[in-house]
């Protein structure tokens, strides 16, 4: 029988990497989270992401004063509701492929009149072209089977001059103890302790961003009009639809 002591650090790292890869592949098979998982997700992962999403909401309302914001994969609705509360002049719509998530989100947003939540697929958005001022997505693209299709839909629905801000996990930002300590101080204990694990499962490696995500973007109308850079706990991809 194998014991923990039989594995050296390198072997443990290989085991962890293999398990992480397996979990990520399992997560990508269902693009939506079924009902029991939706409730658990709303109570756990969103707790880790709460403070980082507050910052994103602040950045959005600073960028867009009036107009329509689309939250792709809005989940339990924290980010959408936070944006709507911060800026009553905005109309916010969250869309999610899980039927349970919009129900959870509507309960969270009760009393907030400028936000709505709908069931739908980010690869086939139920919105007219040139109708969205800014699209945002946090921690969703690692679930997406075809990022290119979602990027193309973002381009279609964005108004000329509009942007899409895509955030997803990037475990490299938690690589050193100093990085984990700094982010923990900035965003709370849970981010410092669990951020690396959450990002490894709910995100992409640097290599995957360069091959899978950049490769998909280069096949869309966003080619030459996007930026990809680490931002706090995330990798942030900024997409621009030129005027």
Map each language-model feature to its residues.
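Conserved class I S-adenosyl-L-methionine
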Residues: 4-64, 67-75, 78-82
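Class I SAM-dependent methyltransferase SAM/SAH-binding core
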Residues: 76-124
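A conserved beta-strand element that flanks and buttresses the S-adenosyl-L-methionine
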Residues: 136
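A short His-aromatic
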Residues: 142-143
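A short glycine-rich, Lys/Arg-flanked "PGG" loop and its adjoining helix->strand segment in the class I
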Residues: 148-160
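C-terminal alpha-helical "lid/dimerization" subdomain adjacent to the S-adenosyl-L-methionine
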Residues: 167-220, 225-236
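C-terminal lobe and adjacent flexible extensions of AdoMet/dcAdoMet transferase-like proteins
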Residues: 237-243
């Amino acid at each position: 029988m194998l014991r923990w002591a039989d594995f050296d650090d390198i072997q443990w790292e290989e085991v962890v990497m293999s398990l992480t890869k397996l979990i990520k592949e399992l997560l990508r098979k269902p693009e939506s989270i079924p009902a029991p998982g939706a409730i658990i997700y709303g109570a756990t992962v969103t707790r880790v992401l709460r403070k980082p999403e507050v910052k994103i909401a602040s950045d959005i309302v600073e960028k867009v004063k009036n107009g329509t914001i689309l939250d792709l994969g809005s989940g339990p609705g924290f980010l959408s509701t936070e944006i709507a509360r911060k800026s009553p002049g905005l109309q916010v719509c969250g869309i999610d492929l899980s039927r349970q998530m919009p129900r959870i989100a509507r309960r969270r947003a009760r009393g907030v009149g400028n936000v709505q939540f709908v069931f739908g697929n980010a690869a086939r958005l139920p919105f007219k072209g040139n109708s969205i001022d800014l699209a945002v997505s946090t921690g969703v693209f690692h679930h997406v089977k075809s990022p290119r299709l979602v990027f193309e839909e973002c381009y279609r629905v964005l108004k000329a001059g509009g942007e899409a801000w895509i955030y997803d996990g990037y475990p490299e930002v938690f690589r050193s103890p100093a990085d984990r300590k700094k982010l923990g101080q900035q965003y709370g204990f849970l981010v410092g302790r669990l951020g690396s694990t959450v990002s490894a499962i709910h995100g992409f490696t640097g290599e995957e961003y360069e091959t899978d995500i950049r490769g998909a973007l280069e096949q869309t109308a966003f080619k030459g009009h996007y930026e990809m850079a680490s931002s706090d706990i995330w990798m942030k991809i900024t997409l621009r639809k030129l005027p």
